[in-house]
Curated annotation (Swiss-Prot):
GO BP terms in the entry: cell differentiation; chromosome condensation; spermatogenesis
Single GO molecular function: DNA binding
Organism (species): Sepia officinalis
Taxonomic path: Eukaryota, Metazoa, Spiralia, Lophotrochozoa, Mollusca
Record keywords: Chromosome, Developmental protein, Differentiation, DNA condensation, DNA-binding, Nucleosome core, Nucleus, Phosphoprotein, Spermatogenesis
Tissue: Testis.
Bias (Basic residues) ranges: 20-77
GO cellular component: nucleosome; nucleus
Major site of localization recorded for this protein: nucleus
Function: Cuttlefish spermiogenesis is characterized by a double nuclear protein transition: histones -> spermatid-specific proteins (T1/T2) -> protamines (SP1/SP2). The protamines compact sperm DNA into a highly condensed, stable and inactive complex.
Post-translational modification comment from the UniProt entry: Phosphorylation occurs at different degrees. The triphosphorylated form may be predominant in T2. SP2 appears to be phosphorylated in elongated spermatids, but dephosphorylated in mature sperm cells.
The protein, known as: Spermatid-specific protein T2
C-alpha cells in the first residue's frame, strides 16, 4: 500500500511540475529529503565515507612508497 501511495504522489507532483507549480515542488522535495536523511543516510554515509577514505589513502600511500622505493633502489644500484 505504501509503494502505491508513493507512486501516486510522484505522478501528482510530476503533473504539478508540468503545469508550473513551483512552490509545491520545493516543499515536497524538502520534506522527502529530510525524512530520508533522518532514517537511512546518516549511518550509510559515515560507513561509506570511512571505507572509501581509508581504502583510497592506503592504496595511494602504498603505491607512492613502492614507486619511490623502486626508483631509489634502481638509481642507487
Amino acid at each position: 500500500m505504501k509503494v502505491a501511495a508513493n507512486t501516486s504522489k510522484m505522478l501528482v507532483e510530476k503533473l504539478d511540475l508540468l503545469k508550473g507549480g513551483r512552490r509545491r515542488r520545493r516543499r515536497s522535495r524538502r520534506r522527502r529529503r529530510s525524512r530520508r536523511r533522518r532514517s537511512r543516510s546518516p549511518y550509510r554515509r559515515r560507513y561509506r565515507r570511512r571505507r572509501r577514505r581509508r581504502r583510497s589513502r592506503r592504496r595511494r600511500r602504498y603505491r607512492r612508497r613502492r614507486s619511490y622505493s623502486r626508483r631509489r633502489y634502481r638509481r642507487r644500484r
